[in-house]
A protein has these predicted regions:
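Conserved catalytic core of the tyrosine transesterase superfamily
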Residues: 1-299
């Protein structure tokens, strides 16, 4: 069940069963619609705590009032508690969700060294030729290398890639198309997957002929499988709630740390507003300040 479908059912529940006021029902409907958009209309079961925190944190950065943010927190906690109670999800990701305070940092990002270690390990595993290992390595290299949303990655077709130019054509929020670059490691990982991994996966079933990344049964790889992959590989270092968006956060932060132009990063990420991208400059500044405090004798 998608988060949109579940949200519609919950809004009906609070209106008909809990009999909340019409104004509160309208507010909850709006809040949950915003959450669904932020989560890229994913399956309800794929939404995790980090995404919920990230969504609320963005509201803080926009300057939304304390009362509005508190209401959104209540709406989300009520929604997921109801979803768990009614069997729509097996676990409630909002149990540890609290109203964020102003100044809260971004959800945790992986360091460049941490990601290098993970990707090096996956590359070594992929050299054995297992189709799933080749795919998994290519997935993580491209997620991080191109700073993609999980929906953008899962929606890629083989024809969307230009390995010579190292670019991918993706469809982002609002069905907006953009071309994003990726580096040599991602290009080599994808090439190896296309030559040695994907053909083996494609033989298992029909229906994924155009899709770049195929699942174990030969169809298009879904967001849930990508979430499981990222959690398995990055969870030990970043926490059990880590998801694909952590790689996007990390890529944006590392680009700015490396001196990339803010507007270039905006285009890579597909942000409609430069203000959304500027959030990552706060992270870079905080990292610099932390390094200063640790290293400077007069800090």
């Amino acid at each position: 069940m998608s988060i949109d479908e579940a949200a519609a059912a919950y809004v009906q529940h609070v209106a008909d069963v809990r009999r909340l006021s019409p104004a509160t029902v309208r507010a909850y409907r709006s809040d949950l619609a915003g959450l669904a958009e932020a989560c890229e209309h994913a399956d309800l079961a794929d939404v995790d705590l980090e995404q919920l925190r990230d969504w609320l944190w963005h509201a803080v950065q926009r300057g939304d009032s304390r009362a509005t943010i508190a209401r959104r927190t209540a709406a989300v906690r009520g929604f997921f508690a109801w979803a768990a109670e009614t069997g729509r999800i097996s676990a409630d990701p909002s149990l540890r969700l609290v109203t964020p305070k102003r100044g809260r940092s971004l959800p945790q990002v992986a360091t460049a060294d941490t990601l290098a270690d993970v990707l090096t390990r996956l590359e070594a595993t992929a050299t054995g030729g297992d189709p799933a290992a080749l795919r998994d390595y290519a997935v993580l290299e491209l997620l991080y290398g191109a700073a993609l949303r999980v929906s953008e990655l899962c929606g890629l077709d083989v024809d969307d890639l230009d390995l010579d130019r190292r670019t991918a054509r993706v469809v982002g929020k609002g069905a907006k198309e953009r071309v994003v670059p990726f580096g040599g490691p991602a290009s080599r990982a994808i090439d190896a997957y296309l030559v040695r991994g994907r053909p083996a996966l494609a033989q298992r079933a029909e229906g994924g002929a155009r899709a770049l990344f195929l699942g174990s049964r030969g169809g298009r790889m879904g967001s849930r499988a990508v979430y499981s992959l990222v959690s398995r590989e990055l969870g030990p270092g970043l926490g059990a709630t880590v998801g694909p968006h952590a790689l996007r956060h990390s890529a944006a932060t590392h680009l700015l740390d490396g001196g990339a132009d803010l507007r270039a990063v905006q285009e890579i990420l597909g942000h409609a507003s430069l203000g959304t991208t500027q959030i990552y400059t706060h992270v870079s500044s905080e990292r610099l300040a932390a390094a200063y405090r640790l290293a400077h004798p007069r800090a």
